[in-house]
Amino acid sequence: MEVEVGQIVNTHGIKGEVKVKSNSDFTETRFQPGEQLLVKHNNTEIVYTVDSYRIHKGFHMLRFEGINNINDIEHLKGDYIYQERDHQDIELGEHEYYYSDIIGCTVFKDDDTPIGRVINIFETGANDVWIVKGEKEYLIPYIEDVVKDIDIENKTIKITPMEGLLD
């Protein structure tokens, strides 16, 4: 199964490098040279092999094998990048999940009151933070004191909010 790992937001320079906004976990692994990425463009699927990867001003900069100038890649601006969900170099530990498993889950308080749906995730260094869209947008830290149960199969998450978390 493929998961969306990013979006080509722009080109960079004239030698065919692209600026990618990642919305994936494990980008250091997924974007390494030699990795294959799928770009869906105008109802066609194109497989590219990563030739080089670096981070520049918060964006992931990729160059693909065989692409050496801006004209060969510019038409992909705005397109999404996909990769196989299960990657041979990624092992999930206990209580670890792919972002694609968490995004879209409905979050409930421990009294079964719905809060909203996870729409995005960002890393803080200490722990991930889930952006949950309900009546407002809430920032829910993925920590043991808050997140009590994750049911990937039913796409539900139960939390015990800390005081002030949902204000």
Curated annotation (Swiss-Prot):
Keywords: Chaperone, Cytoplasm, Ribosome biogenesis, rRNA processing. Signal peptide: none annotated. Coiled coil: none annotated. GO terms for cellular component: cytoplasm; ribosome. Residues 94-165 form the PRC barrel domain. GO terms for biological process: ribosomal small subunit biogenesis; rRNA processing. Its main location: cytoplasm. It is found in: Cytoplasm. One of its GO terms (molecular function) is ribosome binding. Belongs to the RimM family. Binds ribosomal protein uS19. An accessory protein needed during the final step in the assembly of 30S ribosomal subunit, possibly for assembly of the head region. Essential for efficient processing of 16S rRNA. May be needed both before and after RbfA during the maturation of 16S rRNA. It has affinity for free ribosomal 30S subunits but not for 70S ribosomes. HAMAP family: Ribosome_mat_RimM. The PRC barrel domain binds ribosomal protein uS19. This is Ribosome maturation factor RimM. It comes from Staphylococcus epidermidis (strain ATCC 35984 / DSM 28319 / BCRC 17069 / CCUG 31568 / BM 3577 / RP62A). The lineage of its organism: Bacteria, Bacillati, Bacillota, Bacilli, Bacillales.
